[in-house]
Amino acid sequence: MSSQIDAVILAGGMARRMGGDDKGLVELNGEAMIKHTIDRIKPQVKEILINANRNQTRYAEFGFKVISDEHTGFLGPLAGMITAMGQTDADYLLVVPCDCPLLPTDLVPRMLAAIKAENAEIAVASDGEYEQPVVLLLKPSLRDSMKAFLEAGERKVDFWYAKHHFVVESFADQPNAFVNVNTPEQKQRLAMEITK
C-alpha cells in the first residue's frame, strides 16, 4: 500500500535578513519564490498546505489551503509544523521552506525510502555536508511531542528531532538543492543559478 503524503510549505517567518520582505512572495525570475517551491513538490505529494502569518490572501491565490500558526508570536518553524500536523490525516507530512526553489524532484521518494529502510519516524534531508532541519518527512502523530517541546520554550528543530528515531537522507548528488534565500545578494546568485 502506498503512503499518503501531504506537504506544508513554511512561509510564516519574519524574514528579518530580507529587510522584512515576505520571502515567499519575493520575485525570483518573474515568479514568487513560493511558486518555484510549489512546482518542485506538487508532483510528489497529495495535498499542499501553506503556513503563513501575514499576506494570507496573497498566498491563497496559489490555490492551496493557507494556515496560520496556532501559537502566536512568530515562534519559528516548529509552530508552523505543529499547525500543519493538526490539519492533515496523511501518513506522512513533508516540511519544506518557501525559499528553496531548487528542491529535489525526487525528495519524497528518497526520504520515504530512508524512513522505511530504518523503520524511522522522521527523515531529515542533507546536502551531503549539513542537515537541513526544515526539510523533513515526518509522521503527523509526532505533533504532541513537538507541541510539548515548543511549549517548554524550545525552538530548535534539530534538537527536537534528535529526541526521536530519525534518519538522514543525503542529496549530495544535488549540491544546490537546498540553497535558500536570506539576503538580497543570495537572491541574485540564485536567480543566475536557475537560468543556467
Swiss-Prot record:
GTP binds at L10, A11, G12, K23, N51, D69, D99. Mg(2+) binds at D99. GO terms for molecular function: GTP binding; metal ion binding; molybdenum cofactor guanylyltransferase activity. It holds the Pfam family NTP_transf_3. Its cofactor is Mg(2+). Monomer. This is Molybdenum cofactor guanylyltransferase. It comes from Shewanella baltica (strain OS223). The gene is mobA.
